[in-house]
Amino acid sequence: VITNKTISGKETIDAKGLVVAPGFIDGHQHCIEPYEYRLMLRDGRTTILDTEIGAHGPKLNEWYKRREGKAPLNFGVAVAHEFARAEVLDGFKDWKYLYSPDAGQSRLTKEGWSKTRPTLEQGNQILALIDQGLQQGGLGIGSTVGYMRAGVSAREIFELQKLGGRYGRFISMHFRYTPGDDTGETNGIQEMLANAAALGTPAIASHFNNPGYNMVHELLVRMREKGYNVWGEIYPYAAGSTALNAVFLEPEVWVKALGNKYEDTLQDVATGEFYTQKSREEMLKKEPTRLVIVYKIQESAIVDWIKMPGVAIGSDGMPLIPDDNLTWDTPYEDLPNTHPRTSGAFAKVLRLARENNIPLMQAVSMTSY
């Protein structure tokens, strides 16, 4: 409650000279594990959700039970489109984590989850697995279609959004052409928004902080003005993070189509070294899902993103791999390297707002919505 009236409560603190703000909500976090809880709490986050990949549908109940009464923050998860495809098209069943971190294995040796167009029967099996997750309490549907652009048809995305709509749930989507150029980014969200308009269903644009972000933002704003429940999120970094074998990092896309150089844009998380095409090919043979940092846009764009109204912050935080023997008590200096957004996304928004004369209430709104 924000009010000028006299109020009372169980506890009173002296907040003179300070700002009282709600706990921050991170709707895009791929690691909801004890060894990362401290990192997120120190960044002001009190609610952590995995909405982009999510958990495997039949495993939703088990995912929640593993955390009930054990987590010092609020948590939730969407149902994973990618994992339903991995089970149906690749026979994958090695569910160690039940959610996002399992992608390190499901993407390792087989490619059906990414490249195979399902038959009608297989498509219905995929939807049935996702439906199980929605029935078990999945917040919505997470689709990483940008990693599966060859295998996922427009009809499949439409049916996903239709299924979520039956429960009043959202789809959160890594767009079909993300990362890409400004036209691809915009076309990717238009697929999702057209379905949302036709079906009247909610939709979240995952990390649209890519080339084309201005038009994506305008589309979101104009659709909300017309009453549609659609919104987007960004993280305050010019670089992203993903697996080395991501389809959009293939030379045909990253180098030839988008004009990037591996030597300038593709960095190994563990070593800090930049890849060449040759060293990438060599590492793909050894560790295809190795984490990398991807530089994709100019730093100056970050302030533009934080100025945009009606946008939420989602860290897109990554698991710390390998995570064997990591616990709540593991010293910070013993944690493996990862993208800094994992632990610093929300504090960075506050700093950039302060340094660039962006209203504090704008920053608080972005971080707590």
Language-model regions, residue ranges each:
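Active-site neighborhoods of metal-dependent hydrolases
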Residues: 79, 85-151, 189, 193-197, ...
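Alpha-helical scaffold segments that flank or form the walls of functional sites
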Residues: 27-76, 93-97, 101-102, 108-109, ...
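Short, well-structured alpha-helical segments that form the helix of a local strand-helix-strand
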Residues: 360-369
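Histidine-centered catalytic micro-motifs
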Residues: 23-32, 145, 171-177
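Divalent metal-coordination and catalytic microenvironments
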Residues: 17, 28, 44, 75, ...
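Alpha-helix-loop-beta-strand connector modules within alpha/beta enzyme cores
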Residues: 69-75, 154-173, 195-198
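Histidine-rich, glycine-flanked metal-binding segment
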Residues: 1-21
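Acidic-and-aromatic substrate-binding clefts and catalytic sites of carbohydrate-active enzymes
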Residues: 30, 53-57, 149-153, 179-184, ...
